[in-house]
């Protein structure tokens, strides 16, 4: 089923995070038990979607999983982010709005 993610994986391999972060580092919570709950939930949802071939191409991140990824941006970069003036941002709710290509180009990120 992972062949669906080939384009996203290849784009990640070309990006700046490939040497320091895996898929789970960005897309799964770091805390227990959320880590295992989200892993199980995504495993089920991905298996179902891929088996039934019911997913958009290119693959798109859900709003929930986007919130997990943004939380993980702040998990790793929070100290630095607090030093930067994010003009026009009242809350850091979506790092990918301005940094869409940081994880793996713009494939499946920050798009409706």
Name the predicted role of every residue range.
Residues 1-112:
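Short sequence/structural segments immediately N-terminal
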């Amino acid at each position: 089923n992972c062949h669906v993610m080939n384009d996203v994986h290849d784009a990640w391999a070309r990006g700046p995070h490939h040497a320091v972060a895996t898929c789970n580092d960005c897309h799964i919570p770091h805390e227990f038990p959320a880590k295992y709950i989200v892993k199980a939930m995504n495993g089920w949802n991905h298996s179902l979607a891929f088996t039934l071939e019911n997913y958009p191409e290119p693959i798109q991140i859900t709003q929930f999983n986007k919130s997990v990824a943004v939380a993980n941006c702040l998990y790793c970069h929070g100290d630095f982010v607090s030093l930067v003036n994010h003009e026009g941002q009242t809350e850091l709710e979506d790092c990918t709005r301005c940094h869409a290509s940081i994880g793996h180009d713009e494939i499946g990120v920050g798009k409706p």
